[in-house]
Amino acid sequence: MSWEVLTMRSATSFFNPALARSDLRRYWPVLFLYAGLWIIFLPIPVWNRAAERNPALVNLTELCADTYAAAVVLALIFGGIMATAVFSYLMQTRSVGAMHALPQRRGTLFWTHFLTGWAMLAAGNLLVLAVTALAALLGGLALTPALLTWFVVATLLDLIFLALGTLCAMVTGWLLAVPVLYAAVNCLAVALTWLGQQLAELLLDGFTMPDAQPVITRWLTPVYQLICDLGQSGPSYSPFLTGKLPDDRIQNADCASGLAPQGWRTLLIFTAVALVLTVLSRLLYGRRKSELSGDAAAFPWMRPVFRLGVGLVGGLPLGMLLYVLVSVGRSGDFSPARLCVCMAVMGIVCYLAAAMLVGKTLRVLPKRLPGAAVTALVLVLLCVGLRADVFGYADRTPQAEDVARARVYCLDTSFTLEDPRSLETLVKAQAELAENRAADMNYRMTFEVHYVL
């Protein structure tokens, strides 16, 4: 008598069709709204332009290129919405427990929800592509590769912002915190740069707000950099002195693909970053504890980072606002000491508020006093460092031979200098004024010099 054991080979997959269909049934209104808005922005203008003009005079490549800025904005909005929707089960204890009780690996759950969300947005783009092509053919327009380029651009933009939204969903356990964190990440660099420049204008002698954002700020703000390079707007496309595009600048409409090389470069760089963020989100999802759903911070190591970040980022603008409020009606010059006190107070308040939020209790004292003191100290040191000009900004002048031209603003007049001797005289005058700026503090006149190196 022999016994035979029947075995069945088990297979694991990174994608579960049943979960994908569930996401599609639940979140199809997002796809419907996304595709509907795109139909308003692209197929309808193509149809109207072909109907009101001679089709031979209508440039489909230009029409597609004109929508790139809108593509960035729509991807920003719907990428965040889709990420919040497909991972919303992580924010409730019952739903996350039920989902993780399924005989599916966490990798399968993550990739199914992520790819389904991206596929829904890509399907909307494909529908718009078909409707636009049909409208162009019915209007007598010739199809160009720019239409396919638009599809690639829109789909990659959806991936970029979906990846960013997914990362935000992985690090918090509050559903309402996901869009707040997503919005903060997308504007944090610009906001901190602006606040830092405002503080420097108060404390640093000779500092004025620049006309353009620093390069690092633009690259840390994807929506800003993508709109600049895809939509061909921003300081690099409209220099304040020349008032015209550089001679070597290639317009989107001049390219057969409908997108200039600079736009492709920026898009591919952010796509590579999005892939890295997606892998990072997958790793965080594997280490995320189900019982922490409902907490502001989904990981214990994030709590001190959150407290300190809120204390510093909140204390900076609120400290300046408090200084303005307490200085109303006071006579006298600007008081750096008063500003330091206001910054320290608001930094402590914001730090303790964040501690209460993370700890879900009002009893945070005296345990969180050291962290609050560190926050206040950092803000005070920032003010002192700017006031003392530790980097020598006020005395810094360019070399005369490196200056191509300069524009001087004084009172209600302005003029441009391009002659080398005039530029050399201007640089020397600025150096002399910076060296003797404290000679007579009772009478001061402000002028601005914009150098083009």
Give, region by region, the residue ranges found by the protein language model:
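Terminal transmembrane helical anchor/hairpin motif
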Residues: 3-5, 47-65, 187-284, 289-298, ...
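Secretory targeting signals
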Residues: 46, 61-72, 115-178, 182, ...
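Internal/C-terminal transmembrane anchor helices
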Residues: 307-314, 352-393
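Aromatic- and glycine-rich beta-strand/loop motifs that create alpha-glucan
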Residues: 2-35
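Short, structured surface segments that line ligand/substrate-binding pockets
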Residues: 439-453
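Helix-loop-helix units of permease transmembrane domains in multi-pass membrane transporters
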Residues: 86-122, 292-294
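Central hydrophobic cores of alpha-helical transmembrane segments
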Residues: 176-189, 366-378
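Long, hydrophobic alpha-helical segments
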Residues: 66-95
